[in-house]
Structures are given as structure tokens and as C-alpha cells.
A protein has these predicted regions:
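Residues at or immediately flanking beta-strands
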Residues: 1, 17-19, 23, 102, ...
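Single conserved hydrophobic/aromatic residue that forms the stacking wall/gate
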Residues: 1-6, 10-11
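Generic hydrophobic alpha-helical scaffold/packing signal
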Residues: 7, 21-23, 38-42, 50, ...
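Secondary-structure transition/capping motifs at alpha-helix termini
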Residues: 12-16, 43-46
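Conserved strand-turn element in the central/C-terminal portion of the radical SAM core barrel
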Residues: 14-33, 52-70
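Short, electropositive alpha-helical surface patch
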Residues: 29-47, 71-76, 105-108
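Conserved functional loop/turn residues at catalytic and ligand-binding sites
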Residues: 45, 53, 144
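Terminal RNA-binding accessory module
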Residues: 64-161
Length: 161
């Protein structure tokens, strides 16, 4: 049902972007369970997601389940899921190129003169700026999509004279 609700929300309101966390290879996960996960991801379409392999923790009930998923199967499933999620994330980023969004400036970026922040869709956005902007919201035009981030350009600073 979540898949239907999630995809319907995105159809009705284009400003909604879905994000999720996925664990593959949980104790007892079958091929069918994993196929249903992929079907859900295809149905919803995620703007961003985190995905991991399950690792048993001593002392937890799941660690004692007899049907543990072999490590190589977990790795294959994670690779398949991440390929799908990465393609969806890049497609979402590509679709937002050219949009003007408010970006919350979080920190100094990885390159000289660069700042880094987050769009309302939680996309990482890198742009030319300065440290005084940390903590501020600045309007940015999203100019180039990358797999895990966007490049942007400040178009004006709110409240500037």
C-alpha cells in the first residue's frame, strides 16, 4: 500500500520528493521479498535513499533466526538496489536543473570559494559563496545535476539592499 500512496502523492503534488532507508538481507528475507522491495522502489521513485546490508547484532532476536541470508547474496542485492536508487536520484536531480530553490547554507564546500547546503528536497547543493552565509537561506538556481549533488548559482541574497 505504501507504494500506491507514495506514488499518488508525488503525482498529485510535484513538490513532494520521496526519500527512504533500505536494509537488504535481513534474516529470513527471500528472493520474493527482495523482488517486492525493487517493485516498491520502481513504483514510488525516490529522490534520495540510503541502503545498507543487514548485519546481525549479537543478543538480538534477528541474530538467532536460522534463515540468515548469505553475505554474497546481501552484496548482490545491495548492488542491484543501489543501481536502481542511483538512477532514480540522478533522474530527480536532472529534472530539477534550472529550478530556483531556497538553499540552507550548511558549511564551507570542498573547493576554494565554494559553499554547501541543502535544497528543500534535501539535495546537496554546491555554489560559490562565503562563510558569512552559513546558517542563511539563499535562493539558488540549480545549474547542473550530479549523481549525489547539484551545482547552483546564487541569484540574489534575501534581505540584501
Amino acid at each position: 500500500q505504501f507504494g500506491l500512496v507514495g506514488s499518488e502523492m508525488c503525482i498529485r503534488d510535484r513538490d513532494i520528493a520521496m526519500s527512504g532507508d533500505f536494509i537488504v538481507g535481513f534474516s529470513g528475507e527471500t528472493d520474493r521479498d527482495f523482488a517486492e522491495t525493487l517493485q516498491l522502489v520502481n513504483q514510488v521513485g525516490y529522490a534520495s535513499a540510503y541502503s545498507f546490508k543487514y548485519s546481525p547484532r549479537p543478543g538480538t532476536p534477528a541474530a538467532t533466526i536460522e534463515q540468515q541470508v548469505p553475505e554474497h547474496v546481501k552484496a548482490e542485492r545491495l548492488e542491484s538496489l543501489q543501481q536502481l536508487l542511483n538512477a532514480q536520484q540522478f533522474a530527480f536531480n536532472k529534472a530539477t536543473e534550472g529550478q530556483i530553490v531556497d538553499v540552507l547554507v550548511e558549511r564551507i564546500g570542498g573547493r576554494a570559494g565554494q559553499m554547501a547546503g541543502r535544497s528543500p528536497y534535501m539535495q546537496a547543493v554546491n555554489f560559490v559563496g562565503d562563510q558569512s552565509q552559513i546558517g542563511q537561506i539563499v535562493p539558488c538556481k540549480l545549474s547542473a545535476a550530479r549523481q549525489n549533488s547539484m551545482s547552483g548559482e546564487i541569484i540574489a541574497i534575501k534581505g540584501a539592499a
